[in-house]
């Protein structure tokens, strides 16, 4: 019994080793298969890239055949021309920027002046509104005086009409007085006494006749009553 036990253990170890070797072989086979698959994928990818590159080459060839390539100048001349163009463009842009900045500053100054003028006009407008309010108050205060002045103007107009009537009446009265003076200067005729009629009875002595008075009393009466009538009519 003691001899069979080591043999069994050795057999078992051998079997285990064989199994391990088999597993390793299987793993190696799997790795090889994976490597082959990766190689195949890489080959396919390379084939695709080559196909794309071939397509790009064909497209570039077609484009080069269709478009005429310009004849480029010498590299040094191209650099000089590019430098000159860059200098001119930069100077142009700088001048445009300077002009824009000056215009912007001018606009700022104009805006400031406009705002100051607007503020001044606002202050003037406020002053004018206050002044107009004061004038309105003064006009309301003077309104009673204006009413009195209008009333006095109306009364003066009526008085002027009355004075005009009195002036006309005075002129007519003066004319009548002149006429009366002229009539008083004329010689009056003497009235002869009547002849006595022979009668049986003795005639009584005739009474002396009184001189006739000038005809100015009726005119005086008419002139004295006329102003009263005019005044009453008024």
Swiss-Prot record:
Family designation: Belongs to the BLOC1S2 family.
PANTHER family in UniProt: BIOGENESIS OF LYSOSOME-RELATED ORGANELLES COMPLEX 1 SUBUNIT 2 (PTHR46479:SF1)
UniProt KW Membrane keyword: yes
Subunit annotation: Component of the biogenesis of lysosome-related organelles complex 1 (BLOC-1).
Annotated stretches, region: Disordered: 1-58, 184-234
Keyword terms, alphabetized: Coiled coil, Cytoplasm, Cytoskeleton, Lysosome, Membrane
Composition-biased stretches (Low complexity): 7-55, 200-218
Source organism, top-level taxon: Eukaryota
GO-annotated cellular components: BLOC-1 complex; BORC complex; centrosome; gamma-tubulin complex; lysosomal membrane
GO-annotated molecular function: gamma-tubulin binding
Summary of the function given for this chain in its UniProt record: Component of the BLOC-1 complex, a complex that is required for normal biogenesis of lysosome-related organelles (LRO). May also participate in the coupling of lysosomes to microtubule plus-end-directed kinesin motor. May also play a role in intracellular vesicle trafficking.
Subcellular location: Cytoplasm, Cytoskeleton, Microtubule organizing center, Centrosome; Lysosome membrane
Annotated protein name in UniProt: Biogenesis of lysosome-related organelles complex 1 subunit 2
One Pfam family in the UniProt entry: BLOC1_2
UniProt keyword Membrane present: yes
Coiled coil: 145-184
Primary localisation category: cytoplasm
Gene Ontology biological process terms from the UniProt entry: endosomal transport; lysosome localization
Provenance organism: Dictyostelium discoideum (Social amoeba)
């Amino acid at each position: 019994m003691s001899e069979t036990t080591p043999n069994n253990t050795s057999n078992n170890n051998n079997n285990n080793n064989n199994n391990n070797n088999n597993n390793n072989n299987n793993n190696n086979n799997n790795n090889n298969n994976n490597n082959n698959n990766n190689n195949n994928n890489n080959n396919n990818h390379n084939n695709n890239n080559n196909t794309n590159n071939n397509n790009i080459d064909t497209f570039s060839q077609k484009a080069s055949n269709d478009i005429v390539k310009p004849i480029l100048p010498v590299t040094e001349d191209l650099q000089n021309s590019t430098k000159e163009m860059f200098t001119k463009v930069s100077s142009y842009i700088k001048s445009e920027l300077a002009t824009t900045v000056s215009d912007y500053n001018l606009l700022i100054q104009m805006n400031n002046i406009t705002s100051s003028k607007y503020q001044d006009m606002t202050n003037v407008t406020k002053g004018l509104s206050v002044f107009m309010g004061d004038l309105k108050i003064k006009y309301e205060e003077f309104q009673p005086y204006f009413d009195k002045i209008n009333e006095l103007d109306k009364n003066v107009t009526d008085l002027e009409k009355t004075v005009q009537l009195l002036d006309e009446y005075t002129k007519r009265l003066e004319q009548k007085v002149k006429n009366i003076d002229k009539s008083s200067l004329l010689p009056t005729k003497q009235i002869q006494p009547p002849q006595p009629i022979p009668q049986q009875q003795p005639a009584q002595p005739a009474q002396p006749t009184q001189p006739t008075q000038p005809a100015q009393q009726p005119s005086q009466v008419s002139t004295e009553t006329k102003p009263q009538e005019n005044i009453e009519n008024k």
